[in-house]
């Protein structure tokens, strides 16, 4: 059975070894038995539930299957089913028997039991997928009404409905791609149903669905194996020619050399340059060499034209490649060579890599392939099996399409006529596709299945035709009634009349029977004695027949349901002269539709009168029916004498006209004429027909024009048909109409200006337009003469019909045929041309059939081309122009020569009289045609001359100085300019440092202009370079020289006199090492037993080191101690040592950006196996500019955040020093127990929490609720007048019902988005500029704090302890020192930090309790509080607090204003800086914290580290702050990917450094976008003031002119710059006399320069008080501290005094009311007193405990102020 399994049993099987179904507890005891079961039954997909309890399951070997009650009949055994012919046909055996539906049901029943019980014998060879294919196959082959009996049909239908609901809304491209890669037959069927359903309703969904469905139905998802055959055959023929037919190489080599031209080719290649011009020159030379220039240009033009049509399909290639490897699983194979050979053979034949089920079959065939002979035999067996797999996939796909299309044949699915018509067209396309496959010799074994599929589609087509006919108007038949006495010969006359009307046998209807299944639908229908029964309503039946509305006949058989009456002629007989009484209600309708013929036989009547009672002799009847008298009544004559009264009153009042006598022949003619008249209709043609041409002339010239057009048709062998008048006759091409001016015509019109008989002679000169005197384009003329409708294949040939050949091609190879056919085709049709060429050569006796199929799929160009092919199988003539005609014969037909060019325009020019009648489109077409003709004549020469010019300009070498001027000292370039040694050095250094190529003259002129003070760009840059160079002018040293002349004291220069180059113009990608190594404190040397250096290792922490395997191989030592606990994963390894380095480096799985020496890294970071001197190593290829040496292995490659992502393990050596091999970091569990608490556990699975990807925690810390802000007792009634209110309190707050958790989640989502920031090289350059700028006032090597408690006391103790300890820091302190719980946490973190190990970077999340604008409260916007771990904060304070203090100490003059007191004279220094600027921009940013790029923050942290002492504490703090922060709330931990937490240590300084870096990057990019190279320090040319996201930029005119580009670059980095007042609009320069910075307006007042606090911030101090935590903020607090409240309001009055008397009086009244209602014990100051107190504090005369000493301290309860 296994050798005869069909495609449904072979395709998509999934191997699951039997041993996998056995429980692990029994594995050791039954190994031998399971091995036997594995070898004997390898294709089992699933084991039954009882298999685990038996060595050999009895259920799986039983041949009989008991009925489980699901079937209504007895089921034969599986053995009997396998012997049936239906099962044999399913297995593709060669038999001619038809499939039996009953056998199909039996097979399907067994399949259902096999799927349900899983102990069926079929399970030994079939998996679930194969059984499902069998059931779908049964569905496709059975009629739709019989499918309900198939088991699992309902389940499959439900599954398809679910797939339909899932995919119905998907776009067309998604469905087409999915149907190409899906391996689920149910899913494929559902997708096909969606595509076909939307194609049927394309009016609603778009025409592209119908077009795509038609195209996709003609495509098959298979690999065309025949394409390999001609290629392999050509190789064999070539090999035979070289070795057997022509073994003498002397005869072949000269031809080969002459063809290849190796010398010329070698010279071309030697002169090739890898540049654009070099490639153009080389390719042009090669095309010239092989004479393919013209055709190559044409091909390139065609490719460019079709590029945008093809680019949309490019993704299909990736999908196809990916589908080959989807689901592939490794197998435990023994004979690897034969498995590889079998897999390759399977791919070449089927186009698919074998999946696991097929791989099992391959293993069965190759089980004994242990020798070469047995392997070859097994491969031959496999080839036969593989050959069927390609066809099986085709039949599977056709089955799915058939099921999908047949399910659409449902009135509930396709309801309207348009959808039925499209369904009919799609069914015909699929039917034709299946029919084509039945003609394929390879598919012959599957013909029974294909015929059943065609039968199903025939049913769909028939049903659609019936549904169309029911809904459409039909032709009205003609009904004649032959009335007369019995025996006169009416019935015989009716039969004879039927033969004269049609060649078909007439249909017969008997109205005495109520079912009409015998009606055949032929053209003539006879109803004998139609009025013989009174029980039949024959009047209405006749009215229904003779009608334009469709008539559905009542049929009993199911297959005849919906049958329509379709006959053209109805002949009825009756013995009654009046079949319907005139008084009947239906008499008028009846007689209007019928014509009555009164039939009499005079011979019979006379015989009966003469001899009554005797039979009528045969002599009374004649064969020509001349014995009958046929009298045709007039219209609506109900009897011979009278006509129906129109009013229906007196039917005997109107006499009938005399009858018309006819014979049988004239009666037939009369009936035919009546049918034509009844169904005559006139339909107007809309629009302008594309293939209709009208030639307008006068009436007397019509005949002459007609003769001229016929002459043109004969001269050109044209395909058009000449018609006189607008009516069209049949034509294979266009139609040419001769018209008069008054005739209407829908087509292109041309006015004939010259028409005479003499014009016929002009046709000999091919001047068609001159002879006709019309002005038409050459394209229209070619289209008229040679256009062909559709594709026509002619098996018979008439020489007078053959066109004149333009090309004659003798086909000696496939390439000759393909090269010639390309002229006829568009670019899309060239692939079909090559395929057809293969078929013509391989099977020449089937040329017509194959060419018909090919031509139906091919699109031809609009150019007229005729080619005669002389092939081994005969002659093929192909003519194309829009469509194509082809003649294919098995004998020779010689028809060479003829027209070699298209018809030309003759002597008519656009300046003639016909030009005004020519439309503009034709005039421009004529122009473009002329330009194209000119280009075609010069295109080759133009390309060659262009390439020649490039080649000539390539070799223009500059003369090199010789002799005394070799070093270019002296005369240069023949200008007579001589330089001194110093001038020469200066000129060389200037060109080298600024990357210029100035001549001596230009250099001297530039130096002269710079000395004179010129202000142009070049002079300014030269002066900058000169000033930098002169800084080293005094770099001398006093030395004592002892020589022949004695002892001399001289000064010698210790350094070369050159400008100091800071490298500002060197980009990140251009930098080269070696430089300082990263993580210097964490890198150690690995040595051998003798102490010789082998490589490096990197400390990961806790005595664990990372290195590469070949470094630590053998006896390896670290710091004199042997390493231990070595573990490897590929080339990456880890080990332990008791020697611990002072610092540790963080590791991360990612792509590196820097090598160990600081140079940039270019890599794809895709691990592959590489062969090295140490063996094969799995690593990643990278390129850097640093040259490495032996012993560098193990050094770290880092990313932007300083994390180690790989280790150096090899290089390309001296030949390719830039090539590096890097081993990526992989996690190795060293089983170290964590010594510190950490919430975020990477080993836990990710979960989704309200849209955030996070880790679940063991404990839940909820977000604090309520607020401490309350309305003042003085404003319980009017608090709504204040612009601010306490922030939203959560879900119970009526102002905004948004929960606190939702607010936190919405605030965290921007932090989870990636923010790239500025480019790498730009950020790196600006970072160097900022470091140099800060170096002027920040000292180097600032020592870090070595005492943990000293660092702790530098922190603000009113803040949170972080996620590991609840409460604030001061809550865990006693007598000014931390308690045991806090001290233990600090000690654990400090111990790790002293080893340089990064700490967990985790924060607890809360919401800030503050006043917010009312509109933001209603939106639920609150600012988050990131509670930093107290241990991390202590370590960072120890590391960077000294650097931070040094930066903030210069806030008055530096770019960072952190630490400034805006109520001190410092504000005057800011005002002077602002006033000195040319343009001032005040900028604020929206959502600053969440839009920070991690790379920019890492660069700012590196700046702090640059000025530190680089101790392990600094390394730990730096690595901690660079790692991604983790936000902890509500029992989850979220690792964010961007942003800067507001609670990060030193957040104000880091934010301000970020601000400076962003602005510097934006300016740098804007300048260089204007082609201005930046070689100076930007921060020395403009001033900037930053405090976090607040900024004031003082730009010079140069920078202000590109401010739009600067702010545009800032936006491109992910920032959101806005105006300070948050108004909408571009950021523009502001008035320097009133600048807003830190919510202060810096302006001049009568008291001097002051920073005025925002008025709303002052006023809202009186409306709200801080008290106990509560949800009722509208009620005043229970307890008010009069001291702190009085101090708050006192300070508010002082700030109000700076705004003038009017505003102060308003505040004074509020203060008085507050004192009254709040029962305070202080007197508000007067205006003069407040002014005096504030000025005293400002100038430092009077000091107060609540004075704002720095912006980081609180005053005036600034948690209420929005500062």
Curated annotation (Swiss-Prot):
Q: Tell me one Pfam family matched here.
A: VPg
Residue ranges, annotated region (Acidic): 981-986
Q: Where is the RdRp catalytic domain?
A: 1478-1603
Mention any one GO cellular component term assigned to this protein in its UniProt record.
host cell endoplasmic reticulum membrane
The catalytic site is made up of: 1110 (for 3clpro activity), 1131 (for 3clpro activity), 1193 (for 3clpro activity)
Where along this sequence does the record place binding of ATP? Answer: 484-491
Q: InterPro entries attached here?
A: AAA+_ATPase, DNA/RNA_pol_sf, Helic/Pol/Pept_Calicivir-typ, Helicase_SF3_ssDNA/RNA_vir, Helicase_SF3_ssRNA_vir, P-loop_NTPase, Peptidase_C24, Peptidase_S1_PA
User: Where does this protein have coiled-coil stretches?
Assistant: none
| Ranges where the Peptidase C24 domain occurs | 1073-1229
SUPFAM superfamilies noted in UniProt: DNA/RNA polymerases, P-loop containing nucleoside triphosphate hydrolases, Trypsin-like serine proteases
**Record-level GO BP terms:** DNA-templated transcription; proteolysis; symbiont-mediated suppression of host gene expression; viral RNA genome replication
Residues modified as O-(5'-phospho-RNA)-tyrosine are 984
The record's keywords, sorted A to Z, are:
ATP-binding, Covalent protein-RNA linkage, Eukaryotic host gene expression shutoff by virus, Eukaryotic host translation shutoff by virus, Host endoplasmic reticulum, Host gene expression shutoff by virus, Host membrane, Host-virus interaction, Hydrolase, Membrane, Nucleotide-binding, Nucleotidyltransferase, Phosphoprotein, Protease, RNA-directed RNA polymerase, Thiol protease, Transferase, Viral RNA replication
Q: Where is the SF3 helicase domain?
A: 458-614
- Lineage in the entry? Viruses, Riboviria, Orthornavirae, Pisuviricota, Pisoniviricetes
Specify the protein name.
Answer: Genome polyprotein
Per UniProt, what is one GO molecular function of this protein?
ATP hydrolysis activity
Instruction: Give the Enzyme Commission number.
Output: 3.6.1.15, 2.7.7.48, 3.4.22.66
């Amino acid at each position: 059975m296994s050798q005869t399994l069909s495609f449904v049993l072979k395709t998509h099987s999934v191997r699951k070894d039997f041993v996998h179904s056995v429980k692990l507890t029994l594995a050791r005891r039954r190994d031998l038995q399971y091995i036997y079961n594995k070898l004997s039954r390898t294709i089992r997909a699933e084991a039954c539930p009882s298999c685990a309890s038996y060595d050999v399951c009895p259920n799986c070997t039983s041949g009989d299957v008991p009925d489980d009650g699901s079937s209504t009949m007895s089921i034969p055994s599986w053995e009997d089913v396998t012997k049936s012919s239906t099962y044999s046909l399913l297995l593709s055996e060669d038999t001619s028997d038809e499939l039996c539906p009953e056998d199909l049901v039996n097979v399907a029943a067994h399949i259902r039991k096999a799927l349900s019980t899983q102990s069926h014998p079929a399970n030994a060879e079939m998996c679930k997928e194969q059984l499902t294919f069998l059931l779908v196959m049964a569905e496709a082959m059975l009629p739709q009404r019989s499918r309900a009996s198939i088991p699992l049909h309902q389940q499959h239908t439900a599954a398809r409905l679910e797939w339909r609901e899932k995919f119905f809304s998907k776009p067309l491209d998604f469905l087409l791609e999915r149907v190409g890669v899906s391996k689920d037959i149910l899913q494929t069927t559902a997708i096909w149903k969606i595509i076909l359903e939307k194609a049927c309703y394309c009016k609603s969904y778009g025409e592209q669905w119908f077009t795509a469905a038609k195209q996709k139905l003609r495509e098959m998802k298979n690999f065309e194996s025949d394409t390999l055959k001609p290629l392999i055959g050509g190789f064999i023929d070539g090999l035979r020619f070289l070795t057997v037919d022509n073994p003498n190489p002397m005869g072949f080599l000269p031809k080969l050399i002459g063809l290849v031209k190796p010398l010329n080719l070698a010279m071309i290649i030697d002169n090739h340059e890898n540049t654009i011009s070099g490639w153009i020159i080389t390719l042009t030379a090669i095309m010239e060499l092989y004479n393919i220039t013209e055709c190559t240009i044409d091909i390139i033009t065609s490719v460019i034209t079709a590029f945008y049509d093809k680019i949309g399909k490019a993704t299909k290639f990736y999908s196809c490649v990916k589908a080959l490897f989807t689901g592939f699983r490794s197998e435990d194979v023994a004979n690897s060579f034969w498995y590889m050979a079998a897999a390759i053979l399977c791919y070449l034949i089927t186009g698919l890599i074998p999946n696991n089920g097929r791989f099992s079959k391959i293993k069965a065939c190759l089980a004994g392939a242990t020798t070469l002979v047995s392997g070859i035999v097994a491969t031959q067996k496999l080839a036969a099996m593989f050959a069927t797999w390609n066809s099986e996939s085709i039949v599977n796909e056709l089955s799915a399409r058939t099921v999908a299309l047949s399910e659409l044949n449902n009135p509930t699915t396709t309801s309207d006529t348009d959808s039925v018509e499209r369904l009919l067209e799609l069914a015909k396309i699929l039917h034709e596709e299946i029919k084509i496959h039945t003609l394929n010799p390879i598919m012959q074994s599957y013909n029974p299945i294909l015929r059943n599929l065609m039968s199903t589609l025939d049913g769909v087509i028939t049903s659609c035709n019936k549904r169309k006919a029911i809904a459409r108007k039909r032709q009205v038949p003609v009904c004649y009634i032959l009335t007369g006495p019995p025996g006169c010969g009416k019935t015989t006359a009716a039969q004879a009349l039927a033969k004269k009307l049609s060649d078909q046998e007439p249909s017969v209807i008997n109205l005495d029977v109520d079912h009409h299944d015998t009606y055949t639908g032929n053209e003539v229908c006879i109803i004998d004695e139609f009025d013989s029964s009174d029980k039949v309503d024959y009047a209405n039946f006749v009215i229904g027949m003779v009608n334009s509305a469709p008539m559905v006949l009542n049929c009993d058989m199911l297959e005849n349901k919906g049958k329509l009456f379709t006959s053209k002629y109805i002949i009825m007989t009756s013995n009654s002269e009046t079949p319907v009484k005139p008084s009947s209600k239906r008499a008028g309708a009846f007689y209007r539709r019928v014509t009555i013929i009164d039939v009499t036989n005079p011979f019979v009547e006379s015989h009966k009168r003469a001899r009554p009672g005797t039979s009528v002799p045969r002599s009374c009847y004649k064969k020509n029916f001349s014995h009958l008298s046929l009298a045709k009544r007039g219209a609506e004559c109900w009897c011979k004498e009278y006509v129906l009264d129109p009013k229906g009153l007196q039917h005997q009042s109107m006499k009938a006209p005399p009858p018309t006598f006819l014979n049988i022949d004239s009666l037939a003619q009369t009936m035919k004429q009546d049918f034509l008249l009844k169904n005559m209709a006139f339909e107007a043609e809309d629009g302008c027909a594309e293939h209709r041409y009208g030639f307008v002339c006068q009436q007397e010239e019509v005949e002459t024009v007609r003769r001229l057009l016929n002459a043109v048709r004969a001269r050109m062998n044209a395909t058009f048909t000449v018609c006189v008048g607008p009516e069209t006759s049949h034509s294979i091409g266009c139609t040419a109409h001769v018209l008069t001016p008054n005739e209407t015509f829908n087509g292109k019109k041309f006015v004939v200006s010259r028409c005479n008989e003499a014009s016929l002679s002009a046709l000999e000169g091919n001047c068609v337009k001159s002879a006709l005197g019309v002005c038409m384009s050459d394209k229209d003329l070619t289209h008229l003469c040679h256009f062909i409708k559709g594709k026509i294949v002619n098996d018979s040939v008439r020489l007078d019909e053959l066109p004149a050949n333009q090309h004659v091609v003798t086909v000696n190879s496939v390439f000759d045929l393909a090269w010639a056919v390309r002229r006829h085709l568009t670019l899309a049709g060239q692939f079909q041309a090559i395929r057809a060429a293969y078929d013509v050569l391989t099977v020449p006796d089937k040329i017509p059939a194959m060419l018909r199929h090919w031509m139906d799929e091919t699109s031809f160009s609009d150019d007229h081309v005729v080619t005669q092919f002389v092939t081994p199988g005969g002659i093929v003539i192909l003519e194309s122009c829009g469509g194509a005609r082809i003649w294919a014969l098995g004998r020779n037909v010689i028809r060479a020569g003829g027209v070699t060019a298209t018809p030309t325009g003759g002597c008519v020019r656009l300046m003639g009289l016909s030009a005004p009648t020519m439309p503009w489109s034709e005039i421009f077409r004529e122009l473009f045609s002329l330009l194209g003709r000119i280009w075609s004549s010069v295109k080759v020469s133009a390309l060659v001359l262009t390439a020649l010019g490039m080649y000539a300009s390539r070799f223009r070498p500059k003369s090199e100085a010789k002799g005394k001027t070799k070093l270019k000292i002296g005369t240069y370039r023949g200008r007579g300019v001589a330089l001194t040694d110093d001038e020469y050095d200066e000129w060389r250094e200037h060109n080298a440092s600024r990357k210029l190529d100035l001549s001596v003259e230009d250099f001297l002129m530039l130096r002269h202009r710079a000395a004179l003070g010129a202000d142009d760009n070049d002079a300014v840059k030269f002066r900058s370079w000169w000033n930098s160079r002169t800084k080293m002018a005094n770099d001398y040293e006093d030395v004592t020289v002892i020589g022949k002349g004695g002892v001399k004291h001289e000064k010698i220069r210790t350094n070369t006199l050159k400008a100091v180059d800071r490298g500002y113009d060197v980009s990140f990608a251009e930098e080269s090492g070696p430089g300082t190594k990263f993580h210097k404190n964490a890198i150690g040397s690995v040595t051998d037993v003798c102490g010789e250096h082998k490589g490096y290792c990197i400390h990961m922490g806790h005595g664990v080191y990372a290195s590469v395997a070949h470094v630590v191989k053998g006896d390896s030592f670290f710091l004199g101690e042997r390493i231990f606990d070595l573990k490897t994963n590929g080339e990456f390894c880890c080990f332990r040592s008791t020697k611990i380095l002072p610092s540790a480096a963080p590791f991360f799985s990612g792509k590196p950006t820097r090598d160990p020496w600081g140079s940039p890294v270019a890599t794809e970071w895709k691990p592959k196996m590489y062969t090295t001197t140490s063996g094969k190593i799995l690593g990643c290829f990278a390129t850097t500019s640093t040259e490495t040496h032996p012993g560098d292995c193990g050094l770290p490659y880092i990313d932007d955040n300083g994390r180690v992502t790989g280790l150096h393990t090899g290089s390309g050596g001296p030949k390719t020093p830039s090539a590096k091999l890097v081993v990526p970091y992989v996690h190795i569990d060293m089983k170290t127990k964590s010594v510190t608490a950490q919430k975020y556990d990477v080993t836990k699975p990710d979960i989704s929490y309200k849209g955030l990807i996070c880790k679940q925690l063991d404990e839940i810390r909820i977000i604090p609720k309520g607020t401490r802000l309350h309305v003042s007792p003085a404003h319980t009634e009017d608090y709504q007048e204040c612009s601010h209110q306490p922030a939203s309190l959560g879900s119970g707050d009526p102002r905004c019902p948004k929960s606190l958790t939702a607010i936190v989640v919405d605030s965290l989502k921007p932090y989870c988005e990636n923010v790239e920031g500025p480019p790498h090289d730009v950020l790196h350059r600006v970072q160097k500029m900022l470091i140099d700028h800060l170096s002027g006032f920040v000292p180097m090597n600032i020592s870090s704090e070595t005492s943990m408690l000293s660092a702790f006391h530098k922190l603000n103790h009113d803040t949170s302890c972080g996620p590991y300890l609840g409460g604030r820091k001061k809550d865990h302190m006693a007598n000014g020192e931390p308690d045991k719980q806090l001290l233990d946490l600090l000690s654990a973190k400090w111990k790790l930090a002293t080893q340089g190990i990064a700490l967990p970077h985790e924060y607890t999340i809360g919401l800030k309790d503050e006043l917010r604008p009312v509109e933001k409260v209603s939106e639920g916007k609150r600012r988050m509080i990131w509670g930093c771990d107290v241990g991390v904060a202590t370590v960072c304070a120890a590391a960077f607090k000294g650097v931070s203090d040094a930066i903030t100490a210069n806030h008055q003059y530096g770019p960072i204003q952190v630490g400034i007191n805006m109520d001190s004279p410092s504000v005057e220094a800011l005002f002077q800086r602002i006033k000195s600027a040319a343009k001032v921009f005040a900028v604020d940013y929206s959502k600053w914290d969440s839009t920070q790029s991690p790379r920019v923050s890492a660069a700012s942290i590196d700046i702090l580290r640059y000025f530190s002492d680089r101790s392990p504490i600094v390394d730990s703090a730096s690595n901690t702050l660079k790692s991604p922060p983790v936000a902890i709330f509500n029992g989850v931990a979220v690792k964010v990917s961007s942003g800067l937490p507001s609670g990060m240590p030193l957040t104000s300084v880091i934010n301000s450094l970020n601000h400076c870096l962003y602005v510097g990057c934006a300016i740098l990019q804007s300048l260089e976008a204007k082609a201005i190279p930046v070689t100076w320090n930007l921060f020395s040319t403009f001033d900037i003031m930053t405090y976090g996201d607040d900024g004031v930029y003082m730009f010079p005119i140069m920078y202000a002119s590109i401010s739009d580009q600067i702010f545009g670059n800032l936006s491109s980095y992910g920032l959101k710059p806005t105006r300070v007042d948050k108004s909408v609009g571009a950021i523009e320069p502001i008035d320097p006399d009133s600048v807003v910075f830190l919510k202060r307006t810096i302006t001049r007042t009568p008291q001097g320069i002051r920073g005025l606090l925002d008025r709303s911030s002052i006023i809202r101090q009186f409306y709200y008080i801080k008290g106990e935590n509560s949800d009722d903020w509208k009620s005043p607090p229970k307890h008010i501290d009069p001291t702190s409240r009085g101090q708050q309001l006192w300070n508010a009055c002082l700030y109000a005094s700076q705004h003038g008397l009017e505003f102060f009086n308003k505040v004074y009244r509020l203060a008085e009311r507050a004192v009254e209602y709040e029962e305070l014990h202080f007197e508000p100051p007067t205006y003069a007193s407040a002014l005096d107190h504030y000025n005293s504090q400002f100038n430092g005369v009077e000091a107060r405990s609540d004075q704002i000493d720095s912006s980081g301290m609180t005053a005036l309860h600034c948690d209420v102020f929005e500062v």
